[in-house]
């Protein structure tokens, strides 16, 4: 907690967002902006390539993805996730709120249960999809590129 916040008497609410963030697009910006509104400090865990099992491997290498996410004004700090345990970096960050995207396969209830077992008291919030966005997925961007150039 910053000294400025302590002096002002403001409560710091640390929000944690997670994701792959391959081929950054408006959907990612919506997700992170909405997550930021839930608190006054936004941390982001960028998934390691070795931990992504539910979809194709990212096009952009993990070090470049975390650098891009770190460069966004809405983000206070982005870090790479663990290569063995998804909850490891969460213990270090100590969030008050954890956000998950509309398309993430995790159940809010199961995450909260796992967090509770680890002694982490954080609320889990699912962020809604950005409406009216035809290219709000890395897969759709890749499909469009293939359509136009192959």
UniProtKB/Swiss-Prot annotation:
Cofactors named for this entry: a divalent metal cation
Any single biological process term in GO: FAD biosynthetic process
Secretion signal span: none
EC number: 2.7.7.2
Annotated pathway: Cofactor biosynthesis; FAD biosynthesis; FAD from FMN: step 1/1
Annotated positions binding ATP: 20-21, 25-28, 103
GO molecular function list: ATP binding; FMN adenylyltransferase activity
Reactions it catalyzes: FMN + ATP + H(+) = FAD + diphosphate
SUPFAM superfamilies attached to this UniProt entry: Nucleotidylyl transferase (SSF52374)
InterPro entries noted in UniProt: Archaeal_FAD_synthase, Cyt_trans-like, FAD_synth_RibL, Rossmann-like_a/b/a_fold
Keywords for the protein's UniProt record, in alphabetical order: ATP-binding, FAD, Flavoprotein, FMN, Nucleotide-binding, Nucleotidyltransferase, Transferase
Family: Belongs to the archaeal FAD synthase family.
Function recorded in the entry: Catalyzes the transfer of the AMP portion of ATP to flavin mononucleotide (FMN) to produce flavin adenine dinucleotide (FAD) coenzyme.
The protein's assembly and partners: Homodimer.
This protein's name: FAD synthase
Organism per entry: Methanohalobium evestigatum (strain ATCC BAA-1072 / DSM 3721 / NBRC 107634 / OCM 161 / Z-7303)
């Amino acid at each position: 907690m910053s000294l400025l916040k302590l002096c002002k008497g403001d409560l710091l609410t640390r929000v944690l967002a997670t994701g792959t963030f391959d081929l950054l697009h408006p959907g990612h910006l919506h997700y992170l902006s909405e997550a930021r509104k839930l608190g006054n400090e936004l941390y982001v865990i960028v998934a390691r390539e070795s931990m992504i099992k539910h979809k194709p491997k990212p096009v952009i290498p993990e070090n470049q993805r975390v650098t891009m996410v770190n460069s966004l004004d809405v983000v206070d700090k982005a870090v790479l996730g663990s290569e063995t345990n998804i909850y490891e970096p969460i213990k270090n960050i100590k969030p008050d709120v954890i956000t998950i995207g509309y398309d993430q396969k995790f159940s809010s209830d199961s995450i909260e249960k796992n967090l509770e077992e680890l002694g982490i008291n954080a609320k889990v919030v699912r962020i809604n999809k950005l409406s009216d966005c035809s290219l709000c997925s890395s897969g759709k961007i890749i499909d469009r590129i293939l359509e136009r150039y192959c």
